[in-house]
Amino acid sequence: MINTNDFKTGQTIKFNNQIYQILEFLHVKPGKGAAFVRTKLRNLRTGSVIDYTFNAGIKVQPALITKIKMQFLYALEDNYIFMNTQNYEQLEINKHQLKDFLKYLYEGLLVDIIFYENDEIVGITLPDKISIKVAYTEPGAKGDTKTNSLKDAALETGLVIKVPLFINIGEKIIINTETGLYLSRDNNK
């Protein structure tokens, strides 16, 4: 059991028959009355975020979460196939479980699959930045590097983002997976 006084950001708990990750917490000791802990929790099954206040000193059950590094191989109808990089076992995940992550998945991408009690898939963690190929964008003209203008670019996954005017079809760019924003050109090609 975890005491609410020992909460840490990123910790996972089982509470009200759900699995939550602690995003934020704040210990509050008012002048009058008992101390309490304000938290912001993300439900790992649904992705929803809630605010909840615990009485200080109560105990909650920890959630056994395991992260396994896997490589995305390919999509097959409504399922996405991943391979464990340690033992080469393959795992099928339905597209509904992947939610907002589909727009970043391309063949060969390494991700962390999050399991609850080693059998239930509750999430996926993408790298903070990924290098991805531009499938289509309007061609840039000479001198386009002098302004901070942006244009639309369709990536190989189908995601459309804003990129600088000097980016061309076939180039690899680095994007932030949290915000979906262009960061830089990928010079490693």
UniProtKB/Swiss-Prot annotation:
Give compartment(s). Answer: Cytoplasm
In its UniProt record, a GO molecular function of this protein is: translation elongation factor activity
SMART domains for this protein:
EFP, Elong-fact-P_C
Domain of life of the organism encoding this protein? Bacteria
Q: Where's it mainly located? A: cytoplasm
Question: Per the UniProt entry, what are the Gene Ontology biological process annotations, in alphabetical order?
Answer: peptide biosynthetic process
Q: What Pfam families does its record include?
A: EFP, EFP_N, Elong-fact-P_C
Membrane-spanning ranges: none
Q: What's one GO-annotated cellular component?
A: cytoplasm
Ordered alphabetically, the record's keywords are: Cytoplasm, Elongation factor, Protein biosynthesis
Q: In which pathway does it act?
A: Protein biosynthesis; polypeptide chain elongation
What protein family is recorded?
Belongs to the elongation factor P family.
**HAMAP family, per database record:** EF_P
Q: What function does the entry list? A: Involved in peptide bond synthesis. Stimulates efficient translation and peptide-bond synthesis on native or reconstituted 70S ribosomes in vitro. Probably functions indirectly by altering the affinity of the ribosome for aminoacyl-tRNA, thus increasing their reactivity as acceptors for peptidyl transferase.
Q: Provide the protein name.
A: Elongation factor P
Give the organism the record lists. Onion yellows phytoplasma (strain OY-M)
